[in-house]
């Protein structure tokens, strides 16, 4: 059975990244009978930010944690389990101030854990989350995949860096961009993204 982890992060009711990502996850599920989609709406149900109790707890062996510390890492443990169980991960975000939504960053902070999803060695860090395929649906008012504004796109390099640090290197970005350039440009961008979703699903 294939597991697809869908992470949506836009707080906007009229979000375009969310429905396109959800459509991709559903199409991938339909291509492989028996597949399941595990969805985390990070905007509708925000995750806890890491705090002093959490950072102290994850530095201890699980058996040495107090009841309060166990409770502090419970959500993180669940998120990590979902990540390891997933074969495919679909992430949606808008480009907000040149980066990802804070709700998605909080998910990353909860799953990036030394000794769990990556480890330090004498020869450098080693990612422990391997064999995953990631699709990132990124929506933006301007064009940031190429051209003069491309250096301002910190979202894709950041996601590739942090996911790569965890061991996930097979990452494709589906851009839904130029949405602020008028109805015709927006329609074209949405159509291109939907076409790519169809291509990915057919090739799955």
UniProtKB/Swiss-Prot annotation:
Residues that, per the record, bind FMN: 10, 15-17
Family assignment from sequence similarity: Belongs to the azoreductase type 1 family.
Stated name of the protein: FMN-dependent NADH:quinone oxidoreductase 1
Entry annotated with the keyword Flavoprotein: yes
EC number of this enzyme: 1.6.5.-, 1.7.1.17
PANTHER family: FMN-DEPENDENT NADH-AZOREDUCTASE 1, FMN-DEPENDENT NADH:QUINONE OXIDOREDUCTASE
Organism of derivation: Rhizobium etli (strain ATCC 51251 / DSM 11541 / JCM 21823 / NBRC 15573 / CFN 42)
Function recorded in the entry: Quinone reductase that provides resistance to thiol-specific stress caused by electrophilic quinones. Also exhibits azoreductase activity. Catalyzes the reductive cleavage of the azo bond in aromatic azo compounds to the corresponding amines.
SUPFAM superfamilies given in the database record: Flavoproteins
Catalyzed reactions: 2 a quinone + NADH + H(+) = 2 a 1,4-benzosemiquinone + NAD(+); N,N-dimethyl-1,4-phenylenediamine + anthranilate + 2 NAD(+) = 2-(4-dimethylaminophenyl)diazenylbenzoate + 2 NADH + 2 H(+)
